Regions:
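Short cysteine-rich clusters marking metal-coordination/redox-active sites
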Residues: 10-13, 29, 120
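Exposed aromatic-hydrophobic patches
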Residues: 63-65, 101-109
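Short amphipathic, basic-aromatic surface patches that mediate peripheral association
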Residues: 65-73
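Intrinsically disordered, low-complexity linker/tail regions enriched in polar/charged residues
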Residues: 1-12, 21
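Residues immediately within or flanking Cys/His clusters that coordinate Zn2+
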Residues: 7, 16, 26, 117
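Short acidic/polar inter-strand loop motif in beta-rich domains
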Residues: 119-129
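Short metal-binding segments enriched for Cys and/or His
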Residues: 34-48
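Cysteine-rich micro-motifs
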Residues: 23-34
């Protein structure tokens, strides 16, 4: 059963879909079942460039991708960064383009504990499940 906010990808055409309302059945694209994107969060080899982290920049709180800045070229970039409230009722997402800084301002998020996720076009979905927004 597909659940809210899960991401699925077609391995033929590259379409990516997000579940808005979970249900039974199999998601199909190009006549084949779609693959659920696995959430990476502990792959030490790539974690430094992919795991979302919250940092302070003066008075601003931002989510950055990795402790070492992620490349942002046409061939390899972050598609989006998002913050999801712990109860999964609220979501803030920023879509990125190549050459744009891989970060998102979360100053105006009203939820204190949230999940941060980002999607890399080459290395998939990365998650940090236990972020607390400090005032």
């Amino acid at each position: 059963m597909a659940e809210r906010l899960e991401l699925y990808k077609c391995n033929v055409c590259g379409n990516i879909v997000e579940i808005i309302h979970g249900g039974e059945g199999t998601l199909v694209c190009c006549s084949l079942p779609m693959e659920k994107l696995k959430e990476h969060n502990n792959d030490e080899e790539m974690k430094e460039k992919h795991a979302p982290v919250v940092v302070m920049d003066g008075d601003n709180k931002i989510i950055r991708v990795g402790t070492i800045e992620h490349p942002m070229q046409k061939e390899h970039y972050i598609i989006f960064i998002e913050a999801i409230s712990e109860d999964k009722k609220y979501l803030k997402r920023k879509y990125l383009c190549p050459e744009e800084a891989p970060e998102m301002d979360i100053q105006k998020c009203d939820y204190n504990k949230f999940i941060a996720r980002e999607l890399c076009n080459l290395h998939g979905l990365w998650t940090n499940n236990s972020i607390k927004k400090t005032d």
